[in-house]
Amino acid sequence: MLNLDNQKAIDNLHQSFIKSDLPKIQIGDTLKLGIKIIEGNKERVQFYEGTVIAKKNSSINTTITVRKVLQGIGIERIFLIHSPKVASIEVIRHAKVRRSKLYYLRNLRGKASRLKQRFE
C-alpha cells in the first residue's frame, strides 16, 4: 500500500507529463492528429484524420478512439492524448451528438454515418 508521500510524488510526476496546450476534444469531433513515426534514424509526422467515437478520461492515461473509413473499410485507433508520440491535435469540425459513445457508427455506411455539424 502506498503511503501519502509516495502518492504525492506519483501525482507530481503525472502532472509534469500532462500536456496543457490540447484543444477541447468532444465526442463526434473530427480531428487531425499528427503522430510521430520513427523509421531508422529518421523521424517524421504522419497525420491521421477521423471522428472521435469514444473518450476515456483518466488524467495522464486519457484515451480517445478515432474512426475513419478508408476505401470502404472502417479503421479505428486508440490514442493516448498525453503521449509524446502525439505531435499535434487539431479539431477540424464539431458535430452535434447525443451519446457518449458512438459505437453505432460501426454499423452505418455512406451518408448514413454522417453527423450533423455543430457551430460554435
UniProtKB/Swiss-Prot annotation:
This is Large ribosomal subunit protein bL19c. Pfam families: Ribosomal_L19. InterPro entries: Ribosomal_bL19, Ribosomal_bL19_CS, Ribosomal_bL19_sf, Translation_prot_SH3-like_sf. NCBIfam families: rplS_bact. It comes from the Eukaryota. GO terms for cellular component: chloroplast; mitochondrial large ribosomal subunit. GO terms for molecular function: structural constituent of ribosome. Keywords: Chloroplast, Plastid, Ribonucleoprotein, Ribosomal protein. The gene is rpl19. Belongs to the bacterial ribosomal protein bL19 family. HAMAP family: Ribosomal_bL19 (MF_00402).
